[in-house]
Swiss-Prot record:
One of its GO terms (biological process) is D-tagatose 6-phosphate catabolic process. One of its GO terms (molecular function) is 6-deoxy-6-sulfofructose-1-phosphate aldolase activity. It catalyses: D-tagatofuranose 1,6-bisphosphate = D-glyceraldehyde 3-phosphate + dihydroxyacetone phosphate. SUPFAM superfamilies: Aldolase (SSF51569). It holds the Pfam family DeoC. Belongs to the aldolase LacD family. InterPro entries: Aldolase_TIM (IPR013785), DeoC/FbaB/LacD_aldolase (IPR002915), LacD_aldolase (IPR050552), Tag_1.6-dipho_adolase (IPR005927). It comes from the Bacteria. This is Tagatose 1,6-diphosphate aldolase. Keywords: Lactose metabolism, Lyase. SMART domains: DeoC. Pathway: Carbohydrate metabolism; D-tagatose 6-phosphate degradation; D-glyceraldehyde 3-phosphate and glycerone phosphate from D-tagatose 6-phosphate: step 2/2. Transmembrane segments: none annotated.
Amino acid sequence: MALTEQKRVRLEKLSDENGIISALAFDQRGALKRLMAQHQTEEPTVAQMEELKVLVADELTKYASSMLLDPEYGLPATKALDEKAGLLLAYEKTGYDTTSTKRLPDCLDVWSAKRIKEEGADAVKFLLYYDVDSSDELNQEKQAYIERIGSECVAEDIPFFLEILAYDEKIADAGSVEYAKVKPHKVIGAMKVFSDPRFNIDVLKVEVPVNIKYVEGFAEGEVVYTREEAAAFFKAQDEATNFPYIYLSAGVSAKLFQDTLVFAHESGANFNGVLCGRATWAGSVEAYIKDGEAAAREWLRTTGFENIDELNKVLQTTATSWKERV
C-alpha cells in the first residue's frame, strides 16, 4: 500500500513512536445515551454528553496516541486533546434502521471529508455494517458507498479508517451461540472484501474473529471454539489483508480485551493497535451522572488511567507497527 506523504504524516500523528495505534474511542452517541439512561430517569442532554467527552479527552489523551470522536457531541472535546494526540472524526450517523435487515450506511448530513479535515482531524472514520452473505445487490450498494468515501479521502489527502461490523441478516442476537459459530466467516469475509485497493482504505478497524466468551479457557458456559480453532481464526484474519488493521473493543471489559490481545498475538495476529472505547471509560458514566464532574475526573484519574495504562503495556508486547504493512 503506497501512502502519500500527507497520509503518512497524519498516520504518524495517530500512532505512538513505535508505529502502534493506541487510540481512545469515544464517538459513541446512541450507546452513550443508553449508558447514561441507566443512571438517570430524564433523557441525557447534549450538554451532559459533550461534557463527559471533554472530561475523558482532558484526562486520558495524555496516555493515548489518538482519540476518535464524533462531530455531533464531540467537537468541544477536540479542543481538550493532549497536544501530542492525534484526532479521528466519525463520518457516519449513529445506529441503523431497525425496521430492516439491510443496515445501509449513511453519512452525517452536514459533514464531508473536507469538513472533517478542516475541523483538524488526522483521519476520517466510517462505520459499515456488512453481511458477506447478503444479496449481491445490497453489498454492491454498500461497496459503492465506501468507494465514494475513499475517493473523498484521496481528494483531501487524509487517511481513511473503515470500521467493519459484521452481522448476519438472519440472526438477530449477535451474542448468541448461533452467531458465534458463523462470526469468523462473517468477520474474515468482510475484511477480505474491503482489502481491495479500489476502496482507498488506509486502516481497517475490525472485530476479533471470534466471540471470545465462547473460547475454551475464556468461556464460563458453552464452548463454541477450542483454543486451537480460535487461534487459527486469528491467524486467518491476519492473512486476509495486507492493510494495517486495528481491533475494536466491542464493549467488553478492560481485562477481557487485554487478554484477547495477548491471545491474538500468541495466535500469530500481527495487528497494529486498537481503538478502545467502553473498555477504558465506561465506569466514568455512572460517576458523572451520580456525583458530577469532580467524581468523573477522579474515576478517570484512577480506574480510567489504570485501564489505559494496562492496555498500553499489553500493546507494547503484542501489537506491531503499521509501517510493516505499508
